[in-house]
């Protein structure tokens, strides 16, 4: 018999959906039924999501200064809140948990107005706009990188870490095996769940600048956006090297486990997954993020020695080639970075978050939960 329904709400990108998925697996193991509220984009990432049902509720971003666009967005949000209210009244969840992104706004607002227990999980070191708007209303906040002191919402924040998917936990069981000079070197390049055009342009040029011996060692996995596939594939073909190029890899966890070096953006899920698996990384924060959240996430891992942070403006193809030339012949350095990243990882984040969800659903305060955790 189910302990009750937990309604998870997540924006439709991998960065929001993946940690919600990890929590969903834990809650199902504990006897709960899980439903997901999201938007239409999530279908790409929610294929393995263990939800009884996935509900799409209208939502919108209020980012335009155009009065007509703002009015349209407000109407969509109001419609979404009505739909979310009906959904919550029908499902009667014991708690609603939001993972960020504007699709979480209608269900979380509806939950707080209906008196249903509610909490947020913020993946980043800087709170996103949707979560920031909802934070004063919810009972508790779980943080991937948020502090438990010194912040306006610290009194109801628990630093759980970011839950990672079962595939990542399985990959974390594989030790880091360094590549010595002359041996194949696995390089994984990706820009988060939606790709990064910058890497599509920079990496082929950087690899072309390597000497023949180093280039022959490279085994590249590179995620590229669909519109960049033809360009990158053509460049790789000219280089006559081993490479897997695709818009999305369903086995990315295994590819990360095999990596000797990762070059990537620094979204919260990415940083968390790299640290749990324990792989050295060059982190290139997305430069146009409004809240500079990726820079803060990257700094957190770099402080442990598990990664090096390089702003995109400073990372030319020539510099990438120089970095690869050095680290491909310095396995000890990469091994030390891998070990430091592993120490920074929080593989038990999903269990701790599930504990917190159960406590808040049962009516406990954050202070009470912290005391029982100590």
From Swiss-Prot:
Belongs to the glycosyltransferase 28 family. MurG subfamily. Cell wall formation. Catalyzes the transfer of a GlcNAc subunit on undecaprenyl-pyrophosphoryl-MurNAc-pentapeptide (lipid intermediate I) to form undecaprenyl-pyrophosphoryl-MurNAc-(pentapeptide)GlcNAc (lipid intermediate II). This is UDP-N-acetylglucosamine--N-acetylmuramyl-(pentapeptide) pyrophosphoryl-undecaprenol N-acetylglucosamine transferase. One of its GO terms (cellular component) is plasma membrane. Its EC number is 2.4.1.227. GO terms for biological process: carbohydrate metabolic process; cell division; cell wall organization; lipid glycosylation; peptidoglycan biosynthetic process; regulation of cell shape. Keywords: Cell cycle, Cell division, Cell inner membrane, Cell membrane, Cell shape, Cell wall biogenesis/degradation, Glycosyltransferase, Membrane, Peptidoglycan synthesis, Transferase. Pathway: Cell wall biogenesis; peptidoglycan biosynthesis. It is found in: Cell inner membrane. It catalyses: di-trans,octa-cis-undecaprenyl diphospho-N-acetyl-alpha-D-muramoyl-L-alanyl-D-glutamyl-meso-2,6-diaminopimeloyl-D-alanyl-D-alanine + UDP-N-acetyl-alpha-D-glucosamine = di-trans,octa-cis-undecaprenyl diphospho-[N-acetyl-alpha-D-glucosaminyl-(1->4)]-N-acetyl-alpha-D-muramoyl-L-alanyl-D-glutamyl-meso-2,6-diaminopimeloyl-D-alanyl-D-alanine + UDP + H(+). Pfam families: Glyco_tran_28_C (PF04101), Glyco_transf_28 (PF03033).
């Amino acid at each position: 018999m189910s302990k009750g329904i937990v309604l998870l709400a997540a924006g439709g990108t991998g960065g929001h959906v993946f940690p919600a998925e990890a929590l969903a697996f834990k809650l199902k193991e504990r006897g709960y039924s899980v439903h997901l509220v999201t938007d239409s984009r999530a279908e790409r990432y929610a294929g393995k999501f263990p939800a009884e049902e996935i509900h799409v509720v209208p939502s919108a971003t209020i980012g335009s200064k155009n009065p007509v666009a703002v009015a349209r967005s407000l109407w969509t949000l109001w419609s979404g809140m009505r739909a979310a209210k009906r959904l919550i009244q029908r499902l009667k969840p014991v708690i609603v948990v939001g993972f960020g992104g504007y699709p979480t706004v209608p269900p979380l607002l509806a939950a707080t107005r209906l008196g249903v227990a509610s909490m947020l999980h913020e993946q980043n070191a800087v709170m996103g706009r949707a979560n920031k708007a909802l934070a004063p209303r919810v009972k508790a906040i779980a943080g991937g990188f948020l502090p438990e002191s010194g912040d306006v919402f610290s009194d109801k924040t628990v630093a759980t870490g970011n839950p990672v998917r079962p595939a990542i936990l399985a990959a974390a069981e594989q030790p880091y095996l360094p590549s010595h000079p002359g041996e194949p070197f696995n390089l994984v390049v990706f820009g988060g769940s939606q790709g990064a055009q910058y890497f599509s342009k920079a990496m082929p040029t950087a690899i072309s600048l390597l000497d023949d011996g180093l280039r022959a060692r490279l085994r590249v996995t590179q995620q590229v956006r669909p519109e960049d596939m033809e360009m990158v594939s053509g460049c790789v073909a000219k280089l006559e090297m081993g490479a897997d190029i695709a818009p999305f890899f369903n086995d990315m966890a295994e590819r990360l486990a095999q990596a000797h070096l990762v070059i990537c953006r620094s979204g919260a899920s990415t940083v968390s997954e790299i640290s749990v698996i324990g792989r050295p990384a060059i982190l290139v924060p997305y430069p146009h993020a409004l809240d500079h959240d990726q820079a803060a996430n990257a700094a957190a891992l770099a402080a442990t020695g598990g990664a090096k942070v390089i702003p995109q403006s400073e990372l030319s193809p020539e510099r990438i080639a120089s970095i690869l030339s050095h680290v491909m012949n310095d396995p000890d350095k990469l091994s030390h970075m891998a070990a430091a990243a592993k120490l920074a990882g929080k593989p038990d984040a999903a269990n701790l978050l599930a504990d917190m969800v159960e406590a808040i659903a049962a009516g406990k305060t954050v202070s009470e939960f912290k005391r029982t955790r100590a």
